[in-house]
Amino acid sequence: MKKIAITFLILLFTSDISFSKITGLSYGADNSKINLKVYSSLTCPHCAEFHFRTLPKLIEAYASKNMMYIEILDFPLDYPALNAAKIQKCVNNRQDEYLDIIYKTQSKWANAKNLDEVNNNLKKISTKFGISSSDFDKCLTNKNIEKNVLQSRINAQKNYNVNSTPTIVINKKKYSGPLEFDELKIFIDKLL
């Protein structure tokens, strides 16, 4: 009986990805004076540029000092972006690393002949995060995860009239387009 209980516990904690808590990626203290939301699509080249050029500077200058809370939020523009965002939710505490790879290889995995090929490309990437083929399929077909990703887009449209990516919202004020760090710094420093 003891062996059965131990085996059950091992299977419970190692066999499947946990979908109980769907979280996104954030930096800084959530009670900071400045709240910056980044609405992005994982197939958007300007979002990739923002991710590599501007976001690290914002994290270093503000979020790392708890002056700003940065939320990376989903605004998928197409099915490949939707599916990539769903898989992001399944890599748990490695989402930042996942986004690095997704954005670096964006032109390879996203530019496929069809959605099945996109999904196969995403499956190959997900193996780097320990996601098995069956867990990948479960993640991709999980309705709660899909609802979470799509609700982020709906909220962005409803609350901020977001219609393109990347869109930055600083304390509920919207800024669209690929803004550079120096441009955002002007807006941010006025709020400090």
Language model features with spans:
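Extracytoplasmic thiol/disulfide redox context detector
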Residues: 2-82, 123, 127, 145-160, ...
